[in-house]
C-alpha cells in the first residue's frame, strides 16, 4: 500500500509540474516529502493528501509558503500558508463518514464542518474549506454571516451541535461568536485544479440540496 500511496502522489506531482515555475516546483517537492513522511507515520490517507497537494499548488502559485498538517496552538491544521504578514488556513473536507455515524451522517458532517470553522478560523487572517465537486457541505448559514450579525440563538445552536460530537475540548462561546468562513475551494482532483467560490455563492447552490 505504501508504494501505491507514493505512486498516486507522484502522479499528481508529475501532472502539475508543467504549470509551475522551477521555484514553485521545488516547494511542491518539499511538500511531497512531507506527505510521504506523514504517511509512514500513519497520519494521512491518499484521498485527503492529493487534495492537500492540489490546494498547495494553487497557493504556491499565488505566492504563499505552505505547510501541510501544521501544528498550531495544540491543533493540527491541514494546510497553513503565509505570504508577507498574511496567513490562511485550509481545511480539507472529503465527506467521509465513519461507520460509528452510519445512522446520523448529515448531522455528524454538519457538526464536523461547524467545529472546523469555529476552532480554526481564529488562527489565521483567512479560513477556507476545501471540498470536492461531488460533495455538498452542510454549512450553518449563521457562520456565513459577519460575526457581529450572529444572534445568541444561533450561537447556542452551534454550541449544542458541536458539543454533541466534539467536547474534548468543547468549542467556546467566544470562538463561535468570532468564527468566520472566508471562501471555499472546490477541488477537481481529476484535473488537478481548483475553483474558488465566494461563500454566499456556494451556499446559494448548496441550498438546493440542503436538508
Where in the sequence are the language-model features?
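Non-catalytic C-terminal interaction segments of nucleic acid-processing enzymes
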Residues: 1-29, 134-211
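Well-ordered, non-membrane alpha-helical segments in soluble/globular domains
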Residues: 50, 106-116, 155, 164-167
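Catalytic cores of nucleic-acid endonucleases
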Residues: 94-151
Amino acid at each position: 500500500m505504501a508504494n501505491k500511496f507514493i505512486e498516486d502522489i507522484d502522479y499528481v506531482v508529475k501532472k502539475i509540474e508543467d504549470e509551475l515555475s522551477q521555484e514553485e516546483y521545488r516547494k511542491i517537492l518539499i511538500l511531497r516529502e512531507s506527505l510521504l513522511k506523514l504517511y509512514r507515520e500513519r497520519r494521512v490517507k491518499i484521498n485527503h493528501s492529493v487534495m492537500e497537494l492540489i490546494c498547495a499548488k494553487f497557493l504556491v502559485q499565488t505566492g504563499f509558503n505552505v505547510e501541510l498538517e501544521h501544528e498550531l496552538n495544540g491543533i493540527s491544521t491541514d494546510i497553513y500558508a503565509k505570504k508577507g504578514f498574511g496567513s490562511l488556513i485550509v481545511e480539507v473536507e472529503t465527506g467521509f463518514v465513519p461507520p460509528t455515524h452510519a445512522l446520523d451522517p448529515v448531522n455528524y458532517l454538519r457538526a464536523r464542518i461547524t467545529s472546523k470553522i469555529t476552532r480554526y478560523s481564529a488562527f489565521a487572517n483567512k479560513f477556507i474549506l476545501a471540498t470536492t465537486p461531488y460533495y455538498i457541505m452542510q454549512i450553518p448559514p449563521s457562520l456565513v454571516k459577519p460575526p457581529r450579525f450572529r444572534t445568541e440563538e444561533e450561537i447556542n445552536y452551534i454550541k449544542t451541535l458541536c458539543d454533541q460530537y466534539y467536547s474534548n475540548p468543547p468549542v467556546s462561546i467566544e470562538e463561535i461568536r468570532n468564527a468566520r468562513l472566508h471562501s471555499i475551494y472546490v477541488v477537481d482532483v481529476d484535473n488537478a485544479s481548483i475553483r474558488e467560490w465566494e461563500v454566499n455563492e456556494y451556499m446559494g447552490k448548496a441550498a438546493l440540496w440542503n436538508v
